[in-house]
Amino acid sequence: MVATGGQAQDQSHNQEPGVLCPTSAVTGLPQKRYYRQRAHSNPIADHSFDYPARPEDVDWRSMYPSIQQGQQVSFADIGCGYGGFLITLGEMFPEKLSIGMEIRVKVSDYVVDRIAALRRKGADTGAYQNVACLRTNAMKYLPNYFAKGQLEKMFFLYPDPHFKRAKHKWRIINQALLSEYAYVLRKGGLVYTMTDVEDLHKWIVAHMEEHPLYERLTEEEANADPITPKLYQSSEEGAKVVRNKGDHFLAIFRRL
């Protein structure tokens, strides 16, 4: 355990020092094929992570070079994948700091390099200084990064369904973890969940409705949220579901 902010946002993770990551000649962004990894990772396994002892020890400036004195991360995309929705958050809320948390090393490397490339492209305007990605296990270390009542919004988009009953304990939504999420969420904060697996959706809804610190938004409230339309295909996984004409199951909950 060390006091750290995680991987620096401008660091190259997939090449030898001084060698640029392969980028597209058209977009100038890193090419995903160089960052392929298994679709899911075992969150219970003993991965080796550096993590801070407490939120005060996090070096946020290493991830957000333009962070203002006293400014805090407001939005957390848990299991951010390749960062599509995280980037959308940064564009929608330029005054808010958004963090993506991803357990898979190559995938998190890709997001870090993607953000670095976007920052270079937008250097004249200071674009994308408000988004960052951190490789960590959110199921274990979330309270090490965020203070009580710090977050305004948390996102769980297309999480690993862990179909086998014996692996249900690995699901990112369970009663114990919901209490941790409630701790770092401010009152009135929102938890957004989206999946293409109906069984997992029912599991999420059942567990969150059983928890005393959450209430589900009505359909009218959810539809009025400007973020809702972006949940369907801003992420790479969501876009794949749309292409395949799959189902989306949405549930948004308010912290009481």
From Swiss-Prot:
It comes from the Eukaryota. Its EC number is 2.1.1.33. Catalyzes the formation of N(7)-methylguanine at position 46 (m7G46) in tRNA. Pfam families: Methyltransf_4 (PF02390). This is tRNA (guanine-N(7)-)-methyltransferase. The lineage of its organism: Eukaryota, Metazoa, Ecdysozoa, Arthropoda, Hexapoda. Pathway: tRNA modification; N(7)-methylguanine-tRNA biosynthesis. It is found in: Nucleus.
